Amino acid sequence: MKIILKTLSALLSASGESSAHIDADVKYDKYGFPYIQAKTFKGLLRESGLEVCEILGKDYKVVDDLFGKTGNKDSGILAFNNLCLKDFNAIEQELKGQGNILNIEFVKKFFTEIRQQTTIENGTAKDKSLRKYRLIKEGIEFETNIENVPPSQTEFLKFTLLNLRYIGTRRNRGFGKIEIKPVIDQLSTSSNPTAQSSINSTNNVNPLAKLSFEITTMDTLLIAKIFGEQNTVSTEKYIPAQNIRGLIAGMIIKNRNLVNVAHKDAVFKEIILAEKIKFNNAFIKGTQPVPKIYGYDKTDPDSKAEFIFEQQKPMKAMSGFAEFSNAEVKMEEVETTFSFHNSRSDNRLAGRSTKDEGAIFYYEGIAPAQTFESELIGSKSDLNYILPLLEQNGGIHRMGKSKSAQYSKVKFDRIKLAEIKPEILPESKSPVYIVFQSPVITYNEFGTAIPDVSRLQNELVTYIKKLTKISIASSSDTIENYMGVWQSKTPREMAFDIGTTLKIEFEGVLENKILTEMEMAGLGERKAEGYGRISLMNLTDGLVRKNSNNNSNVQVTVPLNPFTNPTLTSIFNNQTAQDELNRLKLKAIGNAAHHYNKLPNSLISKLKESLTNASLKSNWDSFISDIKGKKAHKTLDDANLWESVSQLEVPKDVLNYNSFPTQKLYWLAYFKALRAKQIKPEKNGK
């Protein structure tokens, strides 16, 4: 169901963020365009649904079914997306092709306004009560789609939307009045491809293959990780194999109607429970985890990436993700964003979180419009079953935390299935380097997960018979998963972290076949879940370190409007006019410097007041006629300003220098600069 929301008054859709100048700010994207968070909207709509139930005499169960029950992990049937500006998809596509032409601060000003408020106490402003808010302007339209609306509840949801008339902070103080227009979708038959009902193998020939794909974040993506900060949920900077595996498992269960009996299904066993398919993490496109063997000299920020083994100088370890090429390591940053949320108390009459009830919390997420890539390795028939599942719904799926609102929407694209052809590679000499591409779990004799190099060595000697030495550069991580069937988290376990590097030394040479088998098998436990993935890399010492070029904050100046979208055209024209105005004022201030202390303050104030009140050039001409031949005329003439002031002359390199509005702006800035510079110091020197 598509909905259009229009602000009928200024809206404070507070993000929980503030700055030195703004106490409560709205939520906006990297371009400066405001949006309303889906999680916030869902909570408000749920409250409206309860009111509709009371009006119509319905049971609250319909609200719990649609929106989920408070305090329950079940998120309900409906799925919500952020409310973005109307036609934002077209706006975003045009912006992507035009670089950073628009100033982010000007975009904010185009859609928002700043207001100040204070508290009055005993007839005067209360101490420290001044607050400054950024508000979304009246008349701004937003739109979104509510997904998975049951046809039987369309009418109820429509009433719920129409009943919602105020949103945002301080909505009982005149802010946040809105109008919502639901657009009821026509029912249509889905054309999404359906996975085959069984896994076929022709003539028992089932070659090894890989299914590669890209995952692009359409909304903020939250892959929750264990982090010690209270009221904050942090995210991983990659998409774990466990989430990809869980998504595919969920689709198989749904398509084959396997609720509560999935473990008995042959297809589910083959793809999910057996260790026949290797699920890999999805890293930011073109990168891989930085091997922990690399570090750089702490005393020299521009030093090269060097092996940390046997270094005498102080080294700083490297981490994150990077692209390796041409003796260089290019670090890539995964962009994240923070969002503020609050949960209301059970007391609906309170209307907000109270001191004793409710809570506030922050979600960190991977920002939208970032592309990750991964691949699955397994038999061609198994992967051929998975391929149409990923293509369903145009490749758009939900994964991660808070899937029903704001977070989790991703798009699978560039999905390709190809057989793995055997490569004839030369034998490898000692040493070889193994870099962990996922957490690697090892169990001790009591079944407790403890990172243990000796356990890894026991596995490695089955492949490398003449192993002589293992050196390791590592850190540990704590892993935890969520089991939807159990509605609870799995026990926490310690593991070797991603990027952990093993330097393997041995006698003689190793056949490529052995290395390939070891890479395919992985190391450690729980490999069927996506853990234990490794990569054999040819690492070299002394790489040049570079950072990805991120010029997103550098504004590009262009003389002509490059946009066709009406909203972008309007913003560009206003920004250009404002830029021209700023240049005009700067030119006036610069020229005023030649006449400091040439005119008395009283005359400057008189000129400024008369020009301010003049709505037409003829009004100013009339004022000039009145002072002609008087003392003001002589003072201006002595300062060599009479001709310029009387004619309101503007430098000819200024756009529209002959128009009265331009002349007025220039000379008002000129007089203001003169007056400001002529303020004489007090006797005490201040």
Predicted features along the sequence, with ranges:
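Conserved active-site/ligand-binding neighborhood in enzyme cores
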Residues: 1-686
